[in-house]
Amino acid sequence: MPDILTENAFDADIDIDCLVIGGGAAGMTAALAANDRGLSVLVAEREDRLSGSTALSSGLIPAAETLAQKRQDILDSKEIFFADIMAKNKNMADAKHVKLCIEQVTKAIDWLEVEHDLSLIHI
């Protein structure tokens, strides 16, 4: 179980390998990845609870062709996801980078589910 430090703890020296700023979904995912590599990790969050932009979106994570979607027989594809993103930004985004993000979010979601037992549901 990780230790939770309050502001009073910062009067002491803390020796860590990795500092993650922000305790939202991205920050916590970064912390898990660093921990998986055997690093000691400190997550610094300014709020009194973990939050971030994913919390503002009700915890929704857009992705396509994830294991969770396949298990729930959700018909979606990376091509549909790509078309949705490009239509939303009126084809202004760099298509290469959009495709890379789509590939990486699918891998990240599957990694969180398989390696860290994250339960995902379809809304």
Where are these regions (language model features)?
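N-terminal Rossmann-fold NAD(P) dinucleotide-binding loop
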Residues: 27
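Aromatic pocket-lining residues of Rossmann-like dinucleotide-binding sites
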Residues: 34
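Beta1/beta-strand and adjacent pyrophosphate-binding region of the FAD-binding site
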Residues: 10-24
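Residues that mark the start of a beta-strand
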Residues: 17, 38-40
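Conserved N-terminal/central alpha/beta ligand/cofactor-binding core
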Residues: 2-10, 40, 46-121
